[in-house]
A protein has these predicted regions:
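Catalytic core of the SET domain in histone-lysine N-methyltransferases
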Residues: 1-10, 50-128, 138-143, 147
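Short cysteine/histidine-rich zinc-coordinating motifs and their immediately flanking basic loops
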Residues: 149-157
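Conserved AWS/pre-SET-to-SET junction and N-terminal core of the SET lysine methyltransferase domain
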Residues: 1-50, 84-100, 155-156
Length: 159
């Protein structure tokens, strides 16, 4: 998978990951790596709901990949409302702590194009205007929802 991506400054936010060459749909780009921690450990270590910045990737109902520690270039892939990539879970049949996430292209991607996937962030609290501002999306696409938060019942409850 090496030689497919490069990291540089992004117009969306901070660093971004870009296609180093033309990539066909279905290309496996990179595994999302980092320290493996439980959801309870992540809750104790980070207050990510109020910072709008995290390299935490929820792996399953028990485990999180913490890209802050031991993470690779996958942590720099920005959110996009019209994504050209998707994270695929490769579930281990017996040990969920061995599940893996591979980022793959959703469509053909041109060399130099920024890679993005939909973060689909969700919290078990109402999506207030303040929370939406903290988790604002800056992808700039015509389909931009203005937030990285996953739409659903919490958004409707917040009114």
């Amino acid at each position: 998978m090496s030689g497919l991506i490069i990291v540089r400054r992004s117009r969306i936010h901070g660093n971004g990951v870009f296609a180093a060459r033309d990539l066909p749909e279905g290309t496996e780009l990179i595994e999302y790596t980092g320290r493996l921690i439980t959801i309870a450990e992540a809750d104790a270590l980070y207050d990510e709901i109020h910072t709008g910045h995290t390299f935490l990737f929820t792996l399953n109902e028990e485990w999180i990949i913490d890209g802050n520690v031991g993470g690779n270039d996958a942590r720099w892939i920005n959110h996009g409302c019209a994504p050209n990539c998707i994270p695929y879970l490769h579930a281990h049949p017996r040990d969920r702590s061995k599940d893996r996430v591979i980022i793959e292209t959703l469509r053909d991607v041109e060399a130099g194009e920024e890679l993005q996937y939909d973060y689909g962030i969700s919290f078990e609290v109402p999506y207030t205007p303040r929370l939406k501002k903290i988790w604002a999306c800056r992808c700039g696409t015509p389909r931009c929802t203005g937030t990285m938060l996953k739409s659903g019942t919490h958004e409707r409850l917040a009114g």
